[in-house]
Amino acid sequence: DLFGKELAVLFQLEVDGKAVCVSDDAMEATQCGPIRQNDLQQGEVYDARLKGELTGWHGVRTAPNTLHLIGMNTVPIREQEAFAGRLCRTPNGETVLDFGQNMAGYVEMKLTAHEGQKICLLCGETLDENGNFTQENFQDRNRHKEGGTAQLLELICKEGENHYKPSFTIMGFRYAKVETDIDLTGAEFTAHAVYSEMPVTGSFGCGNADVSQLVQNSVWSQKGNFCDIPTDCPTRERAGWTGDMGVFIETGLTLMDCYPVVEKWLAECRLNQYPDGRMANIAPPTSRPGYMTTMLCMSAGWGDAAILVPYALYKRTGDRKILADNYEMMQKWYAFLLGRAQQTTEEQQTGEYAQYTVLNGLDYGEWCEPG
């Protein structure tokens, strides 16, 4: 319900060659449609009874325009593979949909219901040791989000046939727990994997089924974590950790053409570099900086992505522009690390590479599991 005085976009909507809507300076009213709640990670609440022509428009609240807008510099995000859901019953008596593949995406529903009936899907990646639905593997309660990560889709039905899929949310899942009093006879549930458009560039197969499966797991891990930016997981944090990308970039380029996605992400890294050369461990930032944020932004391994990732892109493509775009960032990070190394005391300096060895400051250490 926010609106400013400066128009940034002019548009004309045409249907069958006829203009049905033209923007002007009077865009000063708003109305709420069927999407009642939405969050990119938490999920969506959709009231199908409100779908259709909107009435009762009301005024908007004006907000100051302080942002510099630029054109989109990424590849499209698409629905990719689709998987039909299989209804099953857990030992606890829960009704659960099994889509047969862990992915990042959402569920499309087709069902018949009475007006006002609800169906809720809670999405999760695995079943627990007893075969019951769980989200415990990715919950951290209030550390990142109050109450944890819901991964909830709720549909409030209209009378008769209902066809729904979310518009602005994706989640990591293979299973979905169903909560409803609707008769699901004849209902259809389809899971759509959603990720950036990246052509497959490599494949692998061998006589060892476990090794082949490991590679396939890596492929699906990439698909589940390359939705506009590379992230660490599609469920809990879903953050652009530099350390993860620094480790995965060579594999990612081998499996899929992720160059455009990573190129865009590097721009976020440049924007979030500190003046003294330290690198933000997460780009773009996902929350307000805490007291540990600035201290850990000198971490070797994580910040090294500033050099490792652009260089990997250059080696794979020969594109010197990626080096030109990121050279200043690379140089500043190198200078910062060299400065840390030169603070090492004479007593600590041993070996041929002593002058390049960092033994001071705060880094992610052995207490942090590998990314």
What are these regions (language model features)?
Residues 1-235, 243-244, 258-263, 276, ...:
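Extracellular/oxidizing-compartment recognition motifs
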Residues 247, 268, 329-343:
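Alpha-helical scaffold segments in carbohydrate-active enzymes
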Residues 251-275:
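Active-site diphosphate/adenylate-binding microenvironment
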Residues 264-267, 280, 324-331:
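Beta-strand segments within the central parallel beta-sheet cores of soluble alpha/beta enzyme folds
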Residues 236-246, 257, 297-305, 325-328:
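Aromatic- and histidine-enriched alpha-helix N-cap/loop-to-helix transition segments
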Residues 247-258, 305-322:
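Well-ordered alpha-helical scaffold segments within catalytic/enzyme domains
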